[in-house]
From Swiss-Prot:
SMART domains found in the cross-reference section: Ribosomal_L2, Ribosomal_L2_C
Protein name, entry field: Large ribosomal subunit protein uL2
Listed Gene3D superfamilies: 2.30.30.30, Nucleic acid-binding proteins, Ribosomal protein L2, domain 3
Gene: rplB
Subunit structure: Part of the 50S ribosomal subunit. Forms a bridge to the 30S subunit in the 70S ribosome.
Family membership noted in the UniProt record: Belongs to the universal ribosomal protein uL2 family.
GO MF terms held by the record: rRNA binding; structural constituent of ribosome; transferase activity
Region (Disordered): 28-57, 219-276
Source organism per UniProt: Exiguobacterium sp. (strain ATCC BAA-1283 / AT1b)
Keyword terms, alphabetized: Ribonucleoprotein, Ribosomal protein, RNA-binding, rRNA-binding
C-alpha cells in the first residue's frame, strides 16, 4: 500500500499521512470469525491501572486469527484481504475446499485467488505454513511458533520477517528481526514470506485526536507531576530530578538498566544476543 499525504487545510492535517488501503478488498469482516471485544482501559480485575496510556478509542470486534496453521493437506484460496483494527498487519480470509473459513496474517505479495496450504508436504511458497525442519536455509519466514502446536508467537507485526540460518540436530537456527539468532525445535511451524503492510511504520499520526481514536491516551513527563505521582515530580518550576539518575514511576532505575531475568530458562536457546 502507498502512503497518502494530505493538504494542510488545518494544522492537524499539515503533516498527517495515511495508508491508501488499496490492497483492502472488503470493509466487512466474516461474522463467524469475529467476537466481542470489551475495553479494559488498562485496568485489571481489581480496577487498578496496570498498563498506562490505554483508554477510549473506536469500538472494535476481535478477529479470530489462525496462528496455528494446522489444517494440513487441505487447500485454501484467498477470498479477501481485510483491515484488522487489533494489529498492524492486514489479514486474509481463506476459504478451504472442505467449506471451513479462517483468517491468517496477510503476507507480503499475497493476492485474492491465490492458493495456500499447510503441512510438511506444502510447497515453499508465500503464505504456506510448514515445520521449520522442512524449510530450506535462507528462506524468509514469519509467524513462528515457540512451542510445537501452540501457534505462532513471534514475527507477527506489519513488515516483520525472520530468516532460516541453519540446522543443529533437532533444532533450527533462526535469525530474528532484532538481530538475535535463536534455536527453535524443528517441529515448530512458521509461514513462508514476510508480513505485509510494511509501510505501516511510515504513517504520521499528525494530531493528538487521531491517537485517541486508536485508544492511546497521553504520555505525561514525570518532571511535571507531583512528588506523590513520580520520583521526578515536585520542586519549584523546572526543577532537576534530584536523584543520581532517572527513575521509572515505580522508583526503579530507567534508561539503560537491564531488566531481563538472569538465568532465564530460554537463555540456552539464544546463540547471539539482539542488537543494542
Amino acid at each position: 500500500m502507498a502512503i497518502k499525504k494530505f493538504k494542510p487545510t488545518t494544522n492537524g492535517r499539515r503533516n498527517m499521512t495515511s495508508l491508501d488501503f488499496a490492497e483492502i478488498t472488503t470493509n466487512r469482516p466474516e461474522k463467524s470469525l469475529t467476537e466481542k471485544l470489551s475495553k479494559k482501559g488498562g485496568r485489571n480485575n481489581q480496577g487498578r491501572l496496570t498498563v498506562r496510556h490505554q483508554g477510549g478509542g473506536h469500538k472494535r470486534k476481535y478477529r479470530i486469527i489462525d496462528f496455528k496453521r494446522n489444517k494440513d493437506g487441505v487447500a485454501g484460496r484467498v477470498a479477501t484481504i481485510e483491515y484488522d483494527p487489533n494489529r498492524s498487519a492486514n489479514i486474509a480470509l481463506i476459504n478451504y475446499v472442505d467449506g471451513e473459513k479462517r483468517y491468517i496474517l496477510a503476507p507480503k505479495g499475497i493476492k485474492v485467488g491465490m492458493e495456500i496450504m499447510s503441512g510438511p508436504e506444502a510447497d515453499i511458497k508465500v503464505g504456506n505454513a510448514l515445520p521449520l525442519v522442512n524449510i530450506p536455509v535462507g528462506t524468509t519466514i514469519h509467524n513462528i511458533e515457540l512451542k510445537p502446536g501452540k501457534g505462532g508467537q513471534l514475527v507477527r507485526a506489519a513488515g516483520a520477517s525472520a530468516q532460516i540460518q541453519g540446522r543443529d540436530g533437532k533444532y533450527v537456527i533462526v535469525r530474528l528481526q532484532s538481530g538475535e539468532s535463536r534455536l527453535f525445535l524443528g517441529t515448530c511451524r512458521a509461514t513462508i514470506g514476510s508480513v505485509g503492510n510494511e509501510e505501516h511504520e511510515l504513517v504520521n499520526i499528525g494530531k493528538a485526536g487521531r491517537s485517541r481514536w486508536l485508544g492511546k491516551r497521553p504520555t505525561v513527563r514525570g518532571s511535571v507531576m507531583n512528588p506523590v505521582d513520580h520520583p521526578h515530580g515536585g520542586g519549584e518550576g523546572r526543577a532537576p530530578i534530584g536523584r543520581s539518575g532517572p527513575l521509572t514511576p515505580w522508583g526503579k532505575p530507567a534508561l539503560g538498566l537491564k531488566t531481563r531475568k538472569k538465568n532465564k530458562s530460554s537463555d540456552m536457546y539464544i546463540l547471539r544476543r539482539r542488537k543494542k
